[in-house]
Design a protein with these regions (language model features):
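A structural boundary/capping signal
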Residues: 2-215
Length: 215
C-alpha cells in the first residue's frame, strides 16, 4: 500500500511539475512578445495629437489652385514640384505636432492619418483624368480617391520618402517607401478606407490588376 501511495504522489508531482513548466513557458513567450512590442514602440512611436484640417488651414492662402490632368506624368511631377514649398511646410507641421521625436515612420503614419481622418471622400460622378491640386484639396477639405492619393504622395515626398500612385480599375491610392524601414518596400496608403491602418489595403482592391506611377 505504501508503495502504491508513493507512486501516486510521484505521478501527482510529475503532473504539477509539467504544468508549472508549461505555465512558465507561456509566461516567457508572453513577456518576449511584450518586450518586442515595447522595443518597436520605442524605435517607432505612434503619432499622437495629429492636427486638424482647421489648424493646417491657417498655413494656406484662400485662393484655389487650378486642376490638372492625372495621366500626363510630367504635369503631375511639375504640380508637385511647384507646390513643394507649401506642402513641405504643412508636412513638417503635421509631423512635428504628431511625433515627439524625429522618427520617419511615425511621421509617415501621421501624414496618412491626417489625410484619412481630415479629408472627406467626395466621389466624382465618373472616374476621369482630372485631378485637383493638392493645395486645393487642403483648402476645400474634400477629395476623390485620386486627389487623396496625390496629396498623400506629395506630403510623403516632402519629408524625404519615395512615393507613387497606384491605379486599379475605377480607383487610385498612394504607396510610400521609407528609408531603412522594412527593406524600403512599398507600403499602401488607402486614405478612402477609414478603417484601414497604415499599410493596409481592402481585399477587394488588393486582388486587382495595378498600374504604378512613381512621382
Amino acid at each position: 500500500m505504501k508503495q502504491e501511495h508513493d507512486m501516486e504522489d510521484e505521478i501527482i508531482y510529475e503532473k504539477k511539475s509539467s504544468f508549472t513548466v508549461f505555465v512558465a513557458l507561456i509566461t516567457a513567450v508572453a513577456l518576449f512578445f511584450l518586450s518586442v512590442q515595447a522595443y518597436l514602440y520605442l524605435m517607432h512611436p505612434q503619432p499622437v495629437d495629429v492636427p486638424s484640417l482647421a489648424e493646417v488651414g491657417r498655413l494656406l492662402e484662400a485662393e484655389l489652385e487650378k486642376p490638372f490632368s492625372s495621366y500626363r506624368s510630367n504635369e503631375v511631377k511639375k504640380v508637385i514640384a511647384d507646390t513643394h514649398d507649401n506642402i513641405k511646410q504643412i508636412a513638417n507641421y503635421i509631423a512635428a505636432r504628431s511625433c515627439r521625436k524625429a522618427d520617419r515612420v511615425c511621421q509617415s503614419k501621421a501624414l496618412y492619418q491626417f489625410v484619412r481622418n481630415e479629408i472627406s471622400y467626395v466621389p466624382d460622378e465618373s472616374f476621369h483624368d482630372q485631378l485637383e491640386n493638392p493645395l486645393t484639396v487642403l483648402k476645400t477639405g474634400g477629395a476623390d480617391c485620386e486627389d487623396m492619393a496625390v496629396l498623400l504622395a506629395a506630403l510623403e515626398k516632402a519629408i524625404g520618402n519615395k512615393a507613387r500612385l497606384v491605379f486599379v480599375p475605377g480607383h487610385a491610392y498612394a504607396q510610400v517607401s521609407i528609408p531603412d524601414y522594412r527593406g524600403e518596400k512599398w507600403l499602401n496608403l488607402e486614405a478612402t478606407c477609414k478603417d484601414c491602418q497604415f499599410g493596409e489595403l481592402p481585399n477587394n482592391i488588393a486582388i486587382q490588376k495595378k498600374d504604378y506611377y512613381e512621382i
